[in-house]
A protein has these predicted regions:
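Glycine- and acidic/polar-rich repeat regions and solenoidal domains
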Residues: 384-387, 406-412, 425-695, 699-700
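Extra-cytoplasmic beta-strand recognition segments
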Residues: 728-731, 771-796, 829-839, 867-869
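Extracellular calcium-associated, cysteine-rich motifs in secreted modular proteins
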Residues: 90-92, 97-98, 114, 939-975
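Short carbohydrate-recognition loop motifs
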Residues: 745-768
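Extracellular polysaccharide-degrading/modifying enzymes targeting complex plant/algal/animal polysaccharides
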Residues: 61-389, 395, 410, 463, ...
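Extracellular carbohydrate recognition and processing domains
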Residues: 810-843
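C-terminal beta-strand-rich structural cap/linker in extracellular carbohydrate-active enzymes
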Residues: 921-940
Length: 975
């Protein structure tokens, strides 16, 4: 991981579909016509009628979260309790003895006294929000805005309240079906448009819009390329940089000021990258930056400002800011000099309904005002919904904030802000931010902020299912709470980057986060870090952190979207009683110390359930990851490539990482519960090998009180054939065995007696060597068990085992990495895999080759000894890998029915709770904000000694738990 929480502040100007610039910073370590515009007639632009219903003016394209998710061939998620609206905040207490003023956009008059909701003869409500600036508003006063009223101006408060006597601006206390609203949009009627050419229409618009909205679909600013223009990357909006950028310092930033374009940039006839052209570039996984282009020589773009970091070849960029880029449905362009707006309607039809152009920069402006309460209003179609930066004690409650070109709520440099029970949807940038540089210059983060019970949807991204509809744009977090703050009971659905981000001293609890990391990654649903952090992260549910491949180099793509992410130097953080499902890594601790990860439920995370990653030794020469406690967690993998623990360091050992105990593993889809790697090599561990071991992750015996399903007395498969490897016993010679190395001298292969019986000892020659088994056939989709006796020249020597095609491209044909570490002492090693291709010499065509087992890349001059290589077909128990998670995101217990009742009713009686191995009784009570992980167990394959071989096929009952055995259930015996 490269991102490092708030250690370095880097400014970046972003600009999304709305087209206006809005600086944002964050963690660092992360074909159409070129016709020129011509004047059009002067159609009328009119504001929306008053009053207007408080409803969004764009299509709400975000689809509901599905109640059921398929996470694998035998794994699923059942999800309930996700709210579709926030709970109402409790009623405000009476506000002292202050005055009450009234506003009504339809019946009011600024000449009135403003002291009654209706009246005549000078008594009655005011009409405009601007009238408040001369109202003499003071502490303890209340301003009541009439239901159904709509204003097209910014609400500004001219005074501050006090802690005991705030100023309150609210809807009427009861009976308000349509909230009073601030609408920053100018509506363009169908008659406002004239045809420019083809599907493109134009209208007069003096002010450059922040965004366009229409009921017929989604608008984005005109751009190049379009999604699908690049055949090699059909789902991406990006072109690819042809070479690394230069390294230059400009305006205090060291990055690239020149970008090398490639053959994929093809401009239409007559098109140019002239004045006004902008470029948006994905600098690395976690940054999408933007700059104006000062020149283009046909091969290089020269930028007005340096990128945040130097750029590398293959990363993506896209272009904006020219009329010729308007070449597809749902795009728009504004010519500021001609005051003309051009648009291709989202449905490709002539304009038949109004289009809304957002032109108001801010909905509610409370900056630098203290103890003001906003309650029950609506804000839509503006740049920033509510700007309260620099304030103290401001409360934002029960407010609907929708369709924002930029931030939903700017709470930078606030103290004691309370943001509660609001609904914030479709914000171009972050929904709620306490980040001190959200608007550019750093002014300080929020402190002692409370963000509670809000519903946030589509923060920094616009989604339809898993499809990103908006243009890539840099955001930071759907909710950023600053320091010594709290985020509780919030729901976040879809975030361009992080779901909830916090600094030190925070409590992050009872939140539900779905679909983080949709535009940028190196990311988490919940993210924090830093020394002396001491935050509490508890009872949260994080699901489906996506990761973002678009804009990454095609040849080296990968995502890093975590559930809960403790980044650089994270210290003293407690991560307890959370659920993480379907992230790349459930919990990632990066260079963290003295953190506690306890009682979490980690299910179906794609790479690992817990990743502890060490790549720094700034504080300790042996590495900065130390003293962590990992205990009483449930870790359930559902993919054969996934791990329970992933423990990695650049240094000599992971032994100082911490202490592991009482963890429970569902280890049937993947038998590898832990994998550790260091500069000395790597090793995979089954649960039997992991339990009680030392040296990987800890100096103490690991998970001595832990549990793995593999040791529950049942096996996952039965042996269904004999050994496929000929001459595996080496009884009389080494026929069929081969070696290879590229550089003389050749390696030496000797058959000799050894403690394993007859063995082969291979010493690699002048270059890395390969030892190959006799040939055999494999069938795609079938499962096999490989076991072998090994001894190596050095302890913890890396043994790259590969089952591959014995010709053509020599491709691997196993569904997982089979490599392991072995020692000087003889030992037996055993593992199972599924064949990914049919390889059979009796067939014709590409499949008509043989398979073989290689020990690949044996280091020059090093030796390895091998005996008793065995490969047998196995038949998995059809229920062995079946599991599920039943998640309750709600605030009350859930009585859940069996999720398999409709499709596999017989399965319901064979399900057990991973938490205690007890059978499930339906309906199942799932506590609030919690999850139950279930697994299926068939009783037909008992395995009394837990060696993976069914009792009926086991020739060696009573094998030592954790020891590898052969297909007969026998562990290594010295001869």
């Amino acid at each position: 991981m490269l991102a490092s929480l708030m250690l370095f502040v880097t400014g970046l100007t972003g600009c999304g579909g709305g087209g206006t610039e809005a600086p944002i910073t964050g963690p660092s370590s992360g074909a159409g016509s070129a016709t020129q515009p011509s004047p059009s007639p002067s159609p009328t632009t009119t504001p929306a009628p008053d009053p207007a219903a408080s409803e969004p003016t764009t299509t709400a394209v975000s689809t509901p979260i599905p109640a059921a998710h398929v996470l694998g061939a035998a794994a699923s998620l059942s999800l309930a309790g996700v709210p579709d609206h926030p709970p109402a905040a409790t009623a405000l207490a009476a506000n002292g003895t202050g005055r009450t003023f009234y506003l009504n956009s339809a019946t009011g008059d600024d000449g009135n006294d403003g002291r009654s909701a209706s009246g005549s003869g000078g008594s009655g409500p005011w009409r405009t929000l601007a009238r408040l600036t001369t109202s003499g508003l003071a502490a303890s006063d209340t301003v009541q805005l009439a239901c159904g009223s709509v204003w097209h101006e910014t609400l500004r408060v001219p005074a501050s309240g006090t802690p005991a006597q705030p100023i309150v601006l609210s809807a009427p206390p009861a009976g308000c079906k349509t909230a009073p609203a601030i609408d920053g949009g100018v509506t363009l009627a169908p008659s406002a448009w004239v045809q420019h050419h083809g599907n493109i229409y134009k209208a007069n618009l003096d002010t450059a819009p922040l965004q366009l909205l229409a009921a017929s679909g989604v608008f984005t600013e005109a751009h190049h390329p379009n999604r699908g223009d690049v055949a090699a990357d059909p789902t991406s909006h990006y072109l690819a940089l042809a070479a690394d950028g230069n390294v230059a310092t400009l305006d205090g930033r060291t990055g690239s000021t020149m970008l090398a374009t490639g053959a994929d940039l093809v401009l239409p006839t007559g098109a140019a990258l002239g004045a006004g052209t902008r470029v948006r570039v994905r600098t690395n996984p976690y940054i999408v930056g933007e700059s104006a282009i000062t020149s283009f020589d046909g091969r290089r773009l020269t930028l007005a400002r340096a990128t945040t970091y130097p750029v590398s070849a293959g990363w993506g960029y896209l272009l904006l800011g020219q009329l010729w880029m308007l070449d597809s449905a749902g795009e728009w362009y504004h010519d500021a000099s001609a005051r003309q707006l051009y648009a291709w309607m989202p449905n490709s039809a002539p304009p038949t309904a109004t289009v809304t152009a957002s032109t108001l920069a801010t909905g509610i402006d409370l900056q630098a005002h203290d103890y003001v309460v906003i309650d029950g209003l609506a804000v839509r179609n503006v740049g920033i919904g509510v700007d309260m930066h620099g304030s103290t004690g401001v409360q934002l409650r029960n407010t609907l904030i929708q369709d924002l070109a930029g931030l939903g709520v700017n709470a930078a440099a606030t103290t004691l802000a309370v943001i509660e029970s609001n609904r914030i949807e479709r914000s171009g940038l972050d929904a709620i931010t306490g980040w001190g540089a959200a608007m550019g210059t750093y002014i300080g983060d929020a402190t002692r902020m409370t963000v509670r019970s809000n519903l946030v949807r589509d923060s920094g991204v616009l989604m339809q299912g898993d499809l990103v509809l908006s243009l890539p744009r840099r955001s930071l977090a759907a909710i950023y709470i600053g320091t010594n703050s709290a985020a509780s009971g919030n729901t976040v659905i879809n975030a361009g980057y992080i779901g909830i981000l916090g600094g030190a001293g925070n409590v992050i609890e009872d939140n539900f986060i779905y679909g983080a990391c949709s535009v940028q990654d190196d990311c988490g649903g919940i993210y924090t870090g830093g020394a002396n952090n001491n935050s509490q992260i508890r009872r949260n549910t994080v699901v489906h952190s996506r990761g973002a491949l678009a804009g990454q180099p095609l040849a080296q793509r990968g995502t890093s979207a975590q559930g809960i992410y403790i980044d650089d130097d994270g210290e003293g953080i407690t991560v307890e009683d959370n659920t993480v499902i379907d992230a790349d890594n459930g919990i990632l601790i990066h260079n963290g110390a003295r953190n506690t990860v306890r009682g979490n439920r980690l299910y179906g995370n794609r790479a690992s359930q817990i990743w502890m990653q060490e790549d720094a030794n700034r504080h300790d020469p042996n590495g900065d990851m130390l003293g962590n406690v990992i205990e009483a967690n449930q870790l359930a993998t559902v993919s054969p490539r996934a791990l329970g623990y992933l423990l990695t360091t650049r240094f000599a050992s992971t032994a100082a990482f911490g202490r592991f105990d009482k963890n429970r593993f569902f280890d049937r889809a993947s038998a590898t519960v832990a994998y550790g790697s260091s500069s000395a090599g790597g090793r995979a561990y089954t649960f039997g090998q992991w339990r009680g071991s030392t040296g990987a992750g800890s100096t103490l015996p690991t998970d001595t009180l832990g549990t793995g399903m593999s040791l529950r007395g049942y096996t996952n498969y039965s042996v269904s054939g004999t050994n496929l490897v000929a001459n595996s016993a080496l009884s009389s010679d080494s026929a069929g065995w081969n070696t290879w190395n590229q550089t003389a001298p050749t390696g030496q292969l000797n058959r000799e007696a050894c403690p394993a019986g007859m063995c082969l000892r291979y010493v690699a020659g002048g270059s890395a060597g390969v030892l190959s088994s006799p040939a055999f056939a494999l069938q795609k989709g079938r499962w096999y068990r490989l076991s072998v006796d090994l001894a190596t020249e050095t302890d913890r020597q890396w043994v790259p085992l590969v089952v591959r095609v014995g010709g053509a491209d020599y491709a691997s044909v196993s569904d997982r990495n089979l490599s392991l570490t072995a020692n000087r002492a003889w030992g037996r090693y055993s593992l199972a895999f599924q064949a990914t291709a049919t390889v059979d010499p009796t067939l014709s065509g590409p499949a008509g080759l043989s398979a073989r087992i290689d020990i690949d890349g044996i280091e020059a001059g090093k030796s390895i000894s091998l005996a008793n290589l065995e490969l047998v077909p196995i038949t998995p128990d059809p229920l062995a890998q079946t599991s599920g998670a039943i998640a309750n995101a709600g605030t009350t217990p859930l009585n859940a029915a069996c999720p398999f009742a409709a499709t596999q009713p017989a399965l319901c009686g064979k399900l057990f709770n991973l938490a205690d191995d007890q059978p499930i009784s339906w309906p199942l009570t799932v506590p609030a904000r919690s999850t139950v992980i279930v697994y299926a167990q068939e009783s037909s394959l008992p395995d009394s000694d837990g060696d993976g071989v069914a009792d009926a096929q086991d020739s060696c009952h009573g094998s030592t738990p954790g020891m590898a055995v052969n297909a007969n259930g026998c562990e290594f015996v010295r001869h």
